[in-house]
A protein has these predicted regions:
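Gly/Ser/Thr-rich helix-start
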Residues: 114, 125, 160, 204-206
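Histidine-acidic metal/acid-base catalytic patches
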Residues: 1-25, 77-81, 119, 135-138, ...
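N-terminal pre-domain/capping segments
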Residues: 1-84
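Active-site acidic/histidine proton-transfer and metal-coordination neighborhood
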Residues: 31, 43, 63-154
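Conserved beta-strand positions in the central sheet of alpha/beta enzyme cores
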Residues: 33, 58, 86, 124, ...
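Active-site beta-loop-alpha junctions enriched in small/polar residues
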Residues: 7-11, 35-37, 61-64, 90-92, ...
């Protein structure tokens, strides 16, 4: 059976982190993914995770920290036992408007990640939908990022691929040699779940999981990370999604 992780960002609007960790353990999770808002005291966080029987196998890090203080990112990752690090986002104002700009951004990520790779940790990019907007004809930013950064690993957010108008399994296969993690999330039918920004619990939305997960399992992907960008009830999301995903 696939071991599913949980992106703690999904629970950012709910109770104290130690309660979230306990809830996830009770729900049956054994892995979590971190994000920048929770790294203030890595040793205390590691203690809470250990007590609950959870491992933080992957983490998201702001590009500014990776570039300006890579040693801090590495220290946090080691304290928490992470196996891979990803930069998760680029603000709209900072996004390139040309193919050359996206290629340069990939090179920037490649250079920023060198200390992390030298420390023995995979480092890469996590996508949204803006990487699938055509630029200068039929070129796509995600291709350009990965071309500019040939050593970058990929955490493919499967639902954002679909929102971007692409078939997730095609991109899983296209970059199977770079894929070490996926975000497992679901999209509601058009016009539904508007109070949750159009997201749905995994297995209860529009994603074709038979096609997508079968493609992922053809790769060496190590981490399957549940995420919901704005759930009304994080415990509901965590439990319903894990129950559904375990049937994939």
């Amino acid at each position: 059976m696939t071991e599913f992780s949980y992106q703690l960002y999904s629970s950012r609007n709910f109770g104290p982190l130690d309660q979230t960790i306990s809830m996830l353990s009770d729900a049956g999770y054994r892995q979590v993914e971190g994000f920048g808002g929770i790294y203030g005291n890595p040793d205390a966080l590691r203690g809470d995770l250990d007590q609950a029987g959870l491992s933080m196998t992957t983490g998201h890090f702001d590009l500014k920290m990776v570039e300006d203080a890579p040693e801090k990112a590495i220290s946090i990752a080691r304290s928490l036992g992470m196996k891979a690090l990803f930069v998760p986002y680029l603000d709209a104002a900072d996004r390139p408007s040309t193919a050359e700009g996206w290629l340069a951004f990939g090179k920037r990520l490649q250079e920023a990640g060198k200390p992390i790779r030298d420390a023995g940790l995979p480092f890469g990019w996590h996508n949204h939908d803006f990487e699938f907007k055509n630029i200068e004809g039929d070129m796509l930013p995600l291709d350009l990022i990965l071309e500019g950064g040939p050593e970058l690993a990929l955490e493919l957010d499967l639902a954002w691929v679909a929102v971007g108008g692409q078939r997730p399994s095609d991109w899983v296969r296209k970059y199977s040699d770079r894929l070490i993690a996926v975000h497992v999330k679901d999209r509601a039918p058009e016009g539904e779940c508007l109070d949750e920004d159009g997201w749905e619990d995994v297995g209860h939305g529009t994603m074709d999981w038979v096609d997508t997960i079968s493609a992922v399992r053809e790769t060496a992907c190590q981490f399957f990370v549940m995420e919901h960008d704005n759930p009304k009830d994080d415990a509901r999301f965590a439990r319903r999604s894990l129950a559904a995903a375990n049937t994939f």
